[in-house]
């Protein structure tokens, strides 16, 4: 609304993140198997940082609404990919640390943290935006991502999976009701 676009465009910008997350999930798993979960988590967090940078550029380019909209779209796509890689990698990293015997516990932790972050993130994002604007919110996003990367880097890596890879379709077929 601030940029002069309709609610349709706002919804499209928001939904881009979720489409990107869904479409990049199979790649996140494949790369985690090849490179190891820690590298995938750091890559995903780097994507979160870059999404914040894209939002900052969108804020700075507010005099050009179409350019700002495209930068917001780019940021949402990058965030979706980053979320996919960070989420997939963190689950696999957790399983690598505690062992497959506790896989249910790791998945539960990941779910609690992920949904807790989404539940808190949306209202905190609105609060930040109302007080410090888009450029300030972008700075917060970049700072949080950078702190997360700095927390992840010193942690021990686990070995990449050596099992037979399954296609995304096969995995989906196993979990689909």
Go through each PLM region and give its residues.
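Residue-level signature of mid-helix packing/kink "hotspots" within the transmembrane helices
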Residues: 18-26, 118-119
